[in-house]
C-alpha cells in the first residue's frame, strides 16, 4: 500500500486470491469496498469532523442560528462525502440521509439524529474498509508464504519455520 501525504490517492495492491474482500450484498458487482471509496483520506477527514461535531452538539444547547449553521454543515458534509465515494455508495448515502427543508429550522433532536445517522453509516463504512484491508493482507501473506515454500528445493525449510511442531537441531558441520 502506498500513501502520499500530499493528496488523497491511496493505492491498494490486491493478490490473486482477491475474492474475500468483496461485499456480499451485490453492490459494486464484485468490486471490493476499498475500490468503492475513491478518496479514502477525504472520507476519513470528513467522518472525523462529523463525529467531533456530533459530540459538540450533544454537549451544548442550540439556538436557531446554530441549528441553521449545523444544517448547512451537515448538507455540505454529505456533498463532500459523495465526491469521495463511488456511485454505489453515493446512492446508498442518498437513500439513507433525509434532506432538511430550507423553509424551517430543524430541531435539536432532528439535527442530532441526522448527525448520529451519518456517523453510524461512516463507522460502518470504516469497519468494512478495515475488514477488507485485513482480508487483503491475509491473502497476500498466504500467497507470499506459498511462494516461499514453492521456491525452495525439497527438504529445505524456511529458517524459523518448524516441521510438525518439533524443533530439530542442525545436522551439518559447524565451522
Curated annotation (Swiss-Prot):
Q: Which residues form a coiled coil?
A: none
Which positions carry the signal peptide feature in this UniProt record?
Answer: none
> What are the recorded GO MF terms, alphabetically?
proteasome binding
Report if keyword Cytoplasm is assigned. no
Q: Where is this motif: HbYX motif?
A: 173-175
Which InterPro entries does the record associate with it? Proteasome_act
Entry GO CC = proteasome complex
Provide a GO biological process annotation. Answer: regulation of proteasomal protein catabolic process
The entry's function note states: Interacts with the core proteasome alpha-subunit (PrcA) through its C-terminal hydrophobic-tyrosine-X motif (HbYX motif). Interaction of Bpa with the proteasome stimulates proteasomal peptidase and casein degradation activity, which suggests Bpa could play a role in the removal of non-native or damaged proteins by influencing the conformation of the proteasome complex upon interaction.
Q: How does it assemble?
A: Forms a homooligomeric, either hexameric or heptameric, ring-like structure which stacks co-axially with the proteasomal alpha-rings.
UniProt protein name: Bacterial proteasome activator
